[in-house]
Amino acid sequence: MFEGERIALLGRSGSCKSTLLAIANGSLRSEQGEVRWCGASIRSMPRRKRREIGMLWQDLLLVEELSVGQNVNSGALGRHNLIWGLANLLFNVDQSACKHCLQRAGLDADLIERGLIDAPIRQLSGGQRQRVALARLLRQQPQLILADEPIANLDPAIASDLLDHLLNRSPEGQLNCGAKAIVISLHQPELVHRFDRVIGLQEGELVMDQPADQLTPADLSRLYEAG
């Protein structure tokens, strides 16, 4: 992939999109082949280097017992000694950094200033929780973002806004989310025009890899109707 590239990962349910993303971020081992990041295998990569690959899971994995700020702050754990990091997470939330990440994730500024950081995560709506998960990812400062259906079950307006915060680029071509590249799995093929490149899977096999602006309705029909 290239710097600034936005990749959509498409395929029917069961096509192994989530599995591919889990292998790419190192949380699942592949039976064959190798995943390399910046020229090095992620299997032998130091933990801190691997943290350059950030994952936005479909299940969010927010900790209900922690506040919004503590959940967001947990994104920075990989950059510190584990014991120091856990203590910092629980007792010394970086309010300024967390507010900045929440704003970049699209949370309302007035809501943030009214004490959202100290609110229990369980009080938030589904859309707000999705944005908190994105803010936690931004707190990690990843160079590569992998997102597993981040807009599933969201209202269309909220989904579109969340994609804006992930995909929009500066006039110089840099992703505003701070990453060098991003891969997002989708169940909404009508959104591929927002990406640069489309990868299609069928039953775990790569069957499509082409520029998004060259994708045709017939290509999508073959991808989703086969099998």
Segments (PLM) and residue ranges:
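Helix-to-loop junction immediately C-terminal to a conserved catalytic motif
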Residues: 25
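Hydrophobic anchor residue at the start of the ABC signature
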Residues: 134
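Conserved catalytic motifs of ABC-family nucleotide-binding domains
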Residues: 141
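Catalytic Walker B motif of ABC-type/P-loop ATPase nucleotide-binding domains
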Residues: 145-149
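ABC ATPase NBD coupling module
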Residues: 41-59, 88-91
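Conserved beta-strand-loop-alpha-helix hinge in the C-terminal portion
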Residues: 205-227
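Conserved ABC ATPase signature
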Residues: 115, 120-124, 128
